[in-house]
Amino acid sequence: MERVVKDGKVAVCYSPGFGAGWSSWADDELKETLIFHPAIVNMILEDKEHLINEQWLVDNFGEEYKYVCTYGAHDLVIEWVPQGSLVRINEYDGYESVEIYDTDNYFMA
C-alpha cells in the first residue's frame, strides 16, 4: 500500500483520545488502510478528520469498511515515523499510541 512520506518519515494515523480507538478497534485486514492510506492522511492534514464517518469509508474503500467504528475519527492525528520502521498501534480504553520497534524498548529473552 502506498504511504505518505515526507523528509524520510511516514505518516501514521492514530486516535489518542479516550473513548474509541481508530485502527485498534477495526478488523485486522482493515487496519493497514486505516493507519497509512493517503486519503485518510490528507483528511487529517487538511483538518477534515471530523468528516470521516462510516459512509466516507465505504465511499472511499468499499463495503467491507461499513462496520468500522469511526467514533475516534475526530481525534485523529499523524505521527511521522522513520521510513522502514516497524510500528504498531497500542490501545487502552480507546486511547491509541504509536509504538516503534527499536532495540531500546525491546529485549531478547
Q: Where are the regions that the model predicts?
A:
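Catalytic phosphate/metal-binding cores of nucleic-acid and nucleotide-processing enzymes, i.e., regions
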Residues: 1-109
